[in-house]
Amino acid sequence: MVPEAKKKVLRFLIDTLNKNNIPFQVSGGLGAITYGATRELRDIDIEINKENCQKARELFKDYIVEDFRRYSDEEFDLWMMTLDIDGVPVDINQVEESYIFKDGEKILLPEGLIDTEMKSIDGIEFPVQNKKNLVDYKQMLGRDTDLTDATEMLATGQ
């Protein structure tokens, strides 16, 4: 589910953020995998507070594909920076002012790094968006992969 190359990048991200005292949470597919989803990991999604975006930009400047920007499409409206670390795509999102669109409605996502749960993959420990919020988010998005993730997450006791 999580290939060694992606685990190596995950370790680097976690070590860098922790060493520089930047609170964060993992969300998206990796978050779902820690709660029992069985799909292959495409990218790594990390959320940080707005106050740490500039610091993160400096720390990861050598890996930036797209700098922090307002990203908006038919599904999302949020601030994010995209990195490529050793071929692994990484999205670092600002946790505040993040929205999804559902049935034409713009919905504000929970703000702040609250109620995270410490999870681990092969001894790599990191805070993950809490299961309820992640399941709710994936169900609201309604994409096939997200619905499968939500179903698998709910079916496990992880």
Please tell me what each predicted stretch does.
Residues 15, 80-81, 116-117:
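Residue-level detector of beta-strand structural context in well-folded domains
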Residues 18, 84, 120:
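Anion (oxyanion) recognition and catalysis
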Residues 1-25, 155-158:
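Helical scaffold of the NTase/Pol beta-like nucleotidyltransferase catalytic core
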Residues 104-158:
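Catalytic cores of NTP-dependent nucleotidyl/adenyl transfer enzymes across multiple folds
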Residues 56-63:
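Short amphipathic alpha-helices in soluble, non-transmembrane regions
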Residues 9-10, 34-40, 44-47, 76-90:
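Accessory recognition modules or surfaces
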